[in-house]
């Protein structure tokens, strides 16, 4: 009887280890789902931010172009002046204006490029999150089923069905 009890206890311990492993697997998939949800929300946030940054960069670019054309027109008129000093000064100012315009446009284009990259990264994060959520969801279903089966087996081992003992008493 003692050997049978020891064997039963070791079987229960093994089954408890199986239950613990199944629970760890469930926890792993739940953590993956949390990561997936986080990726999706961060990706959506990045996309939203990038849209406003793109709009801002495009508006700045339009404003820079408009100001440049206005200033250029005035300076070109002065450069065509008969007064040589005024014309030389206007030409120098025009050169300076062109250089400033190139720098400002380059900066606006860089902001636009960064916003576009941020949008692409956000889209990648959303896709990655959706894929991870799908695989983790499927894995979680299987892991929960395994956990329930292992727990049921453990419960049965700890509390054997009472029908067998009651049928022996009737005989």
Language-model segments: what does each one mean?
Residues 4-171:
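Extended amphipathic alpha-helical heptad-repeat regions
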């Amino acid at each position: 009887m003692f050997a049978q009890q020891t064997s039963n206890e070791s079987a229960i311990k093994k089954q408890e280890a199986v239950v613990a492993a199944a629970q760890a697997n469930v926890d792993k998939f739940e953590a993956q789902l949390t990561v997936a949800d986080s990726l999706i929300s961060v990706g959506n946030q990045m996309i939203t931010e990038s849209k406003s940054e793109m709009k801002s960069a495009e508006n700045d670019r339009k404003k820079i172009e408009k100001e440049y054309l206005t200033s250029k027109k005035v300076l070109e008129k002065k450069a065509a002046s008969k007064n040589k000093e005024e014309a030389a000064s206007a030409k120098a100012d025009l050169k300076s204006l062109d250089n400033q315009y190139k720098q400002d446009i380059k900066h606006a284009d860089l902001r636009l490029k960064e916003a576009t990259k941020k949008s692409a990264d956000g889209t990648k994060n959303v896709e990655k999150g959706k894929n991870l959520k799908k695989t983790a969801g499927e894995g979680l279903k299987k892991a929960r089923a395994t956990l329930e089966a292992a727990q049921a087996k453990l419960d049965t081992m700890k509390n054997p069905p009472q029908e067998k003992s009651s049928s022996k008493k009737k005989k």
